[in-house]
Amino acid sequence: MKHKRLSGLLALLMCSVLMAGCAGMAAIDDYAVNEGYELKVSSSGTGNKAGSGKSTPGISKDKIKVGVIHLSDPAEGSGYTYTHDIGIQGMQQNLGLSDSQIVRKNNISDTDADATRTAIKECIDAGCNIIFTTSWGYMQTTAEMAEEYPDVYFSHGTGYMSNGRNFNNYFGRIYQARYLSGIVAGMNTRTNRIGYVAAMGSDSAEVTGGIDAFALGIYSVNPDAKVYVKVTNSWFDPQGEEAAARTLLNMNCDVIAQHCDTVYPQTLAQEKGVYSIGYNSDMSKEAPDACLCSVTWNWSAYYTSAVQSVIDGTWDGSNYYGGMNENLVSITSVASFAAPGTQEKVNEAKQQILAGKNGVFDGVIETNTGATVGTAGKTLDDSTITGGINWYFKTVSVVE
């Protein structure tokens, strides 16, 4: 999702930061304040941003207890919650924690602050000393609970709030993998009409930035292809996601990509005999004859480092923004039935990204309104990528 997601408010905040002089790819140290909480966006490279700079008391591994708040049930399939829980399981295995040291709260609506508060409080009452809240809508309640319980560590996924002490934010450069998946789509469409099921519209920089990165990847290999976006206005809506995919198929789109939580766009593509691009985890198992590749998260990379920092006493409230170099985001191998040369083209572009020679949002970029963003010879900075992309690339159209 997910989730979840930079809002128009964040974009406004970031605009003020940019006007103050942020630009380029140099290391940044940008802050904005929202209701008393410090907003921090990490620089590229290491994936971490300095927090308070103060060390914290370590907690012995046998005393660690981890809480995780999930939007849905991990057992539901290959979507967002499943992927986060695979990351939690990976962390547990990496650190040698027992099952009793993990407390899960599933099916917690991120639009219900009372339910979120109750779930977090139950984790605290169960003895959890670090709690991960995985969906955008948990952000405000997580921030409030962090102030109420300063001795508990809180880590919120996909938002922007943090306090530099016991509450941080984590997300990743998923746009890098989106770009690569765009190359795959662009090399395999026959109609030059590619569909994209999007959870949110242009007020979400996370979703819109992903669409633009995808479209830029397509454009790099097939400038004649167009991207058609259908928005569901929900992070998790199985029926709505399938309906959106069906609309795009009816428009003669022959590749369906997605930024939403379930596998329904994939299974519909499988049923209708067209190609698809999965998201969150490898969705080829649900759509073996359709899925060309999947844009994936390896959340265990972050969860392991975060819990280890609490054990070691090195937690400092840093925000985390990892990418391909940190093994947080990637795409799966291209399907054997893809067009010849697809995997080779992806490999070439991936090496350029890893080497810092392709920042995805490079140079002057033309939007679908005819306006331009960016500067020749420069890459959009992290503040803009995470909070200021409310425009669509010139090959993108939104379907009403």
Annotated model-derived regions:
Residues G24-E400:
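A residue-level marker of the well-folded mature domains of exported/periplasmic proteins
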Residues L13-M14:
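Repetitive helical segments and hydrophobic/amphipathic motifs
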Residues M1-L10:
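Bacterial N-terminal signal peptides that target proteins for export
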Residues V17-G21:
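C-terminal motif of bacterial Sec signal peptides marking the signal peptidase cleavage site
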